[in-house]
Amino acid sequence: AVCSDHVQMCEWRKYKSPMESSLIANDVDQETIDSLMRTVEKNVDLYREYLKLKAKLMNLPKLGNWDIVAPLPNAPDMEFEWEEARREVVESYRSFDDEVGAWVEEMFERRHIDGEVRKGKRSGAFCAPWFSGKSAWILLSFNRKLGDVYTLAHENGHAVHDYLMSRNQKPSNAEIGACIAE
């Protein structure tokens, strides 16, 4: 019923396809979505191989959704110092693009990342854009685990979007579309 209502609404509004309203709302074109889907399809076998290997290592015939993020059995309990995590994250971005790596380094240099674990601070992580400062702020609780390094890298991805957005858009036009938000 919901899908047929949506299709009917799109027909009434003369959209070319049922996706067109979402494309407009997210300021993205069909070509970009098609490219994203081709990239996923091109690489999905690698991800499937990883999942099969993980299931085997976990002694499971098939992974459940909850197993995807579960730690591997007997995996070393690695710990990272803040500076080590910083180096890993910045170098990962630099390996993609030197300029992007420099933006991430700037987040650390400007002390725009609050990773300290302290009493009263909630766990979790988020990145908030700071338009007037042409930057962003990241809040997370860095407990020195590998997952914290991943989270630090992930939130810096949002900061890169915010960095570019604050330099190329007006605040009223700056919302990141759902197709690239995460």
Give the label of every model feature segment.
Residues 1-182:
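Cation-handling catalytic/transport regions enriched in His/Asp/Glu
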